[in-house]
Amino acid sequence: MARLTQSFRLLPRPWDPSAPGAREMGEPDLFTCACCGLITPGRRFPWHGDGPGPVCALCNILQDPTRPAIEREAVLIWWPKLPQTRIMTLTRCAHQALMQTLGNGPNGQDVVWHRAMDAIASGSDTAMMPAQCKSALAVLRALHARTTEARRRLETTFPRLLATALLMANRADPQINESATTLMDGIRLFPLGRLYNGPTDIYPALVREWLDADPQPVMT
């Protein structure tokens, strides 16, 4: 598994299902994501980070922090000691474990899913969730808690604002470049359990697809 990316980087790439290398959802062949390292069916995207191979739709958001719905899909966190690839692995494993506990039906399950994601983002109580969800919820809460430090350092947790600021920065100035490099060494992107294709959140369906390909428990 080629999972070498330690920090969040600007690797702009619009999310385009018709782009070379992209696959349609539901395609039966499996691949190992070059970023999170997890077995994935269907849609894949070329990886412009370290290491060869395609990435899953979740990890692909690292490559375009200015996507139209990015503020609903991810937030910035501060965790220098935890590689970005590890964050993606932990997040996707927690999401799969949570979906596995909720069941495998696309209707009422999505409502519960979104309530759980909202509770994690807002710090609300999740006591009504099944006990089997506790481990996954604890991981997601611990990751989201690092938004506090990101906000203290950046005065924002919005990926688009950071990406815009970095793209506009005069990196030819040694001091600015050093500050930006130090910042990027510690900033990470944390997915919020949503992924939009236009107005539609397709992420719950993607998680179910991943579970169908690998139904074994992914977190205990």
Please describe what each predicted stretch is.
Residues R3-P14, M99, G108-D125:
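Alpha-helical interaction/linker modules in multidomain eukaryotic proteins
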Residues M1-L76:
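N-terminal cysteine/histidine-rich coordination modules
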